[in-house]
A protein has these predicted regions:
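Short glycine-aspartate micro-motif
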Residues: 3-7, 57-61, 95-98
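Short glycine-rich, Thr/Ser-proximal phosphate-binding strand/loop in the N-terminal lobe
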Residues: 3-41, 45, 116-119, 123-124
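Short beta-strand-loop/turn "lid" adjacent to the catalytic site in phosphate-handling enzymes
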Residues: 26-32, 50-81, 108, 117
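Glycine-rich phosphate-binding loop plus the immediately following alpha-helix
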Residues: 28, 113-156
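Adenine-nucleotide phosphate-binding core of ATP-dependent small-molecule kinases
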Residues: 170-201
Length: 205
């Protein structure tokens, strides 16, 4: 028997297929998000990799920002619960999970048995999320995947003071116009994310 897990996120859809021996036999990630049928494409890719069809799936669980788009699933589970179960399955003994998604960020504290003890989410729009980093990459004229490499070349630390993504974008544009380097701004963006996540870690206990 095969089991299907689908995560319909705000910026991408992820699929994993597991057999009855608890082995992950196929995965797929499609970067399109909830406004499309990206999860169907991801499922097709995973089915092809595993050499199976939907008829071979015994049970399906869906999670994520857009999980309501897949009502055919046998069960819908929150991202918080899925994070806890997935991390506990892959790495025993983990007590803290940090998830920086496209639209929100979460810090999850686990109990000794791997269940959720507490969690906190970001409070200010897209601040501290993947969307914030996407905006920073766009302003700096690079791909999101290139942002960390750019930050590694910084020669000083700068602070991005605005917590709102819209205002932070304006602040970064002003700094660049004033002569600040893209490398230093990229590092500042990473530091801004890190500080916000660390604040969440403090609140989760």
């Amino acid at each position: 028997m095969m089991y299907l897990g689908v995560d319909i996120g705000s910026s991408s859809s992820k699929v994993a297929i597991m057999n009855d021996r608890d082995e992950i036999v196929a995965t797929s990630v499609v970067n399109l998000g909830t406004g499309s049928n990206a999860y169907e494409t991801a499922m097709d890719e995973a089915f092809e990799t595993a050499g199976i069809t939907s008829a071979d799936i015994a049970y399906t669980v869906v999670t994520g920002y857009g999980r309501v788009r897949f009502p055919e699933a046998d069960k819908q589970i929150t991202e918080i619960t899925c994070h806890a179960k997935g991390v506990s399955f892959l790495m025993k003994g983990i007590r803290t999970i940090i998830d920086i998604g496209g639209q929100d960020a979460k810090v999850i504290k686990l109990k000794d048995d791997g269940s959720v003890e507490n969690f906190v989410m970001n409070e200010k729009c897209a601040a501290g999320t993947g969307r914030f980093m996407e905006v920073m990459a766009r302003v700096l004229g690079c791909e999101l995947s290139e942002l960390s490499g750019l930050a590694d070349k910084a020669d000083k630390e700068i602070s991005i003071s605005n917590v709102c993504t819209v205002f932070a974008e304006s602040e970064v544009i002003s700094r660049l116009a004033a002569g600040e380097t893209s490398e230093n701004v990229a590092r500042g963006a990473h530091l801004a994310i890190a500080k916000r996540v660390m604040g969440m870690c403090g609140r989760v206990g």
